């Protein structure tokens, strides 16, 4: 048994089979429609989220894990015999999950619970946990894994092409006028996670097809070596994600490029149809 338990917020979108194979523990964040709360990927699938969103007048909100839920998880891991816990969070700039985890760690065992701000989102965040869990299974200490995670945090990136501006408007990130003009002119923002973990529009492209091509160009310009894992992500747009995957595979034939769902928590802001690319350096 590994001495270090790896915990990921559910926003990491780690497939269930990977969670099981690597003994990763998941702390679930919820999406909220009115008074009804759903844990992402447990109580609500991406398909159900899109269907519910299409028939919902307002903007869904998100709910971070409760302190009670987080404390119970930590205590159960120590009861199982783990000596240390590393909890990898979605960017602290985008959710209160990181602060809640810090508070809970202080209450349970601050010396042996290490709360790590990934400063990123969705499966880019998930890869932090996947590679950390591999290190834990190899017998690495908590300090060794934390140093490894610092390296990943300095060498990762996430870009998303936003197809539908509705949620950006509902959430106040775009004015009604900006959203109307954007829709009329088919303006599609390219958003990037910044080094401090904020999510900002960095380019505006006319038509979604050209926005997807820009994602591919950015990935190509980066000239990723085989030390990097490259992935494609989407929310309800598998066809577009496969197109991006196919073109990236031609550029990077030695990389295994897989497709993952975007976190429902992120989809609340990014809206349906968004496609993203992300990469982390893992060795």
Locate each region found by the language model.
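Short beta-strand segments
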Residues: 7-8, 87-91, 117
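Short, Lys/Arg-enriched, disordered terminal segments
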Residues: 1-3, 282-283
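Glycine-rich phosphate- or other oxyanion-binding loops that anchor nucleotides, phosphorylated ligands
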Residues: 57-58, 64-91, 99-100, 146, ...
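N-terminal glycine-rich anion-binding loop in soluble enzyme alpha/beta folds
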Residues: 5-64
């Amino acid at each position: 048994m590994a001495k270090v338990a790896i915990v990921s917020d559910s926003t990491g979108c780690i497939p269930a089979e990977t969670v099981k194979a690597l003994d990763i523990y998941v702390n679930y964040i919820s999406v909220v429609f009115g008074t009804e709360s759903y844990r992402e990927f447990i109580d609500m699938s991406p398909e159900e989220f899109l269907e519910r969103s299409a028939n919902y007048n307002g903007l869904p909100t998100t709910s971070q894990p409760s302190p009670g839920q987080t404390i119970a998880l930590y205590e159960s891991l120590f009861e199982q015999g783990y000596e240390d816990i590393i909890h990898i969070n979605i960017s602290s700039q985008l959710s209160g999950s990181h602060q809640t985890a810090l508070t809970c760690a202080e209450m349970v065992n601050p010396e042996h619970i290490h709360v790590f701000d990934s400063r990123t989102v969705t499966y880019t965040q998930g890869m932090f946990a996947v590679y950390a869990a591999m290190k834990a299974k190899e017998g690495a200490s908590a300090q060794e894994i934390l140093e490894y995670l610092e390296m990943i945090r300095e060498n990762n990136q996430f870009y998303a092409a936003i197809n539908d501006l509705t949620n950006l408007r509902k959430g106040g990130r775009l004015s009604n006028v900006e959203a109307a003009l954007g829709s009329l002119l088919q303006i599609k923002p390219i958003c990037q996670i910044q080094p401090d973990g904020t999510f900002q529009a960095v380019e505006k492209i006319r038509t979604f097809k050209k926005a997807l091509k820009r994602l591919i160009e950015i990935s190509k310009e980066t000239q990723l070596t085989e030390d990097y894992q490259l992935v494609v992500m989407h929310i309800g747009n598998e066809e577009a994600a496969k197109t991006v995957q196919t073109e990236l595979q031609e550029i990077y034939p030695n990389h295994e490029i897989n497709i993952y769902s975007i976190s429902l928590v992120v989809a609340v802001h990014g809206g349906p149809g968004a496609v993203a690319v992300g990469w982390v350096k893992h060795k």
